[in-house]
Amino acid sequence: DFVVVNGENAAAQGVGLTEEICKDFYNCGVNVITTGNHVWDQKEIMKYIEKEERLLRPKNLFEPAPGRGFQIFKTDKNIRVGVLNLMGNVFMKKCDDVFETSKKFLSEYKLKDDYDLLVVDFHGEITSEKMAIGHFFDGYSTCVVGTHTHIPTADTRILDKGKGTRKKTAKASRSVV
């Protein structure tokens, strides 16, 4: 198994996360924590994200940003899992163009060459942007999962090239791919 959690709203008042919360997730079996627009709301996370490769921030945050937005992990069965964390542009003003970042990413990394599976966590506000990213990565990823806490999880799809997409997962404590 390989567990990815979007933990950006796990801290008090539902904004950000802390080192302690990350460690609690890891102790529960989480392999990777992704984030979104609330990644920096708990300032202590800025130091921790620099040293913790299992904690990702959106790759398309304005540079220079602490941490990383993509990492390749190996499972117990030696399967290489790439996890890419992206954030939408609609109503999210802290990031570069998600499609340009995605295009650059796909020119640098290839499914099966660099990793066996690619999980894309797309943190965004609107369903149409999540669907557009799903189609953008169709055939280039294993799955695309849309995260944020504003819409219900009721829209799983298998796209033309056989990859599933889900525009929304549950909150951090239940957000498992």
Named regions from a protein language model:
Residues D1-V177:
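Acidic, metal/ion-coordinating pockets
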